[in-house]
A protein has these predicted regions:
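Conserved NAD(P)H cofactor-binding loop of Rossmann-fold oxidoreductase domains
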Residues: 71-76
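Active-site loop immediately N-terminal to the catalytic Tyr-X3-Lys motif
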Residues: 81, 129-133, 186
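Residue(s) in the substrate-gating loop at a strand-loop-helix junction
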Residues: 122
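C-terminal helical subdomain
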Residues: 162, 182-221
């Protein structure tokens, strides 16, 4: 089975659709249901206690885990001077803590099944961007966690991928900024194209591990 966090919207939703079409059992972990999921485990990933319950629900399904894709995330666009402690907790809990705790709670089954792990970071986790200090810090942290996972699982059959796409069109950016325009004038990538790229990485032979991939928007004119 394919476990996807945050499959109710955006990239997670497109991934769920692709895997459903491929005949895989899809398990969504998020606050809202995913129409493509075979199992919806509705939990708030900001809360550690709910993540533990979600992990137990996954294990109770009794099926091998093929991949865990940590896709759930929230965006923060706030200038320095206006960042609050609550905002830091909101972003770090969803973007970093949730992935760490979910993997930690499932690690024995992950090793047993040789399950792959994909942590969806961002190009914001590779360089600094104006007004994205908290979001950027969360994505840098997620990349750090991924690097540690790669070391800890290097002698297993589990592949660990840091997936770092640039901006693609979802409701996430529009909700945070009130618009859907790119700052540099390039066109947004499509979530379905980004999802296909991620799936293709996991479709590679098991002895091929793409440790990190960066996908940038490219001007077409």
């Amino acid at each position: 089975m394919i476990i996807i966090t945050g499959a109710s919207d955006g990239l997670g939703l497109e991934l769920a659709k692709l895997y459903k079409e491929a005949g895989k059992k899809v398990v969504n972990i998020s606050r809202r249901p995913c129409k493509y999921a075979d199992e919806n485990i509705l939990k708030n990933l900001r809360e550690g206690s709910e993540i533990e319950v979600a992990a137990k629900a996954v294990l109770a399904l009794g099926e091998p885990i093929e991949a865990l894709i940590n896709c759930a995330g929230v965006l923060s666009v706030e200038p320095l001077g206006k960042i609050t402690e609550d905002e830091i907790k909101r972003v770090m809990s969803t973007n970093v803590k949730a992935a760490i705790l979910l993997v930690s709670n499932l690690i024995d089954r992950i090793k047993q099944d040789g399950a792959d792990i994909v942590n969806v970071s961002s190009t914001v986790g590779l360089k600094g961007y104006v007004d994205q200090a908290v979001y950027g810090a969360s994505k840098w942290a997620l990349r750090g966690f991924t690097a540690n996972l790669q070391t800890e699982l290097k002698d297993t059959s589990s592949r660990v991928i840091s997936f770092c796409p640039g901006g693609f069109k979802t409701k996430l950016f529009e909700k945070a900024t009130g618009n859907d325009n790119t700052a540099d004038g390039t066109e947004w990538m499509r979530a379905e194209d980004v999802a296909l790229c991620l799936k293709q990485l996991l479709d590679l032979p098991k002895n091929m591990e793409v440790s990190e991939i960066v996908i940038n928007r490219k001007a077409t004119k």
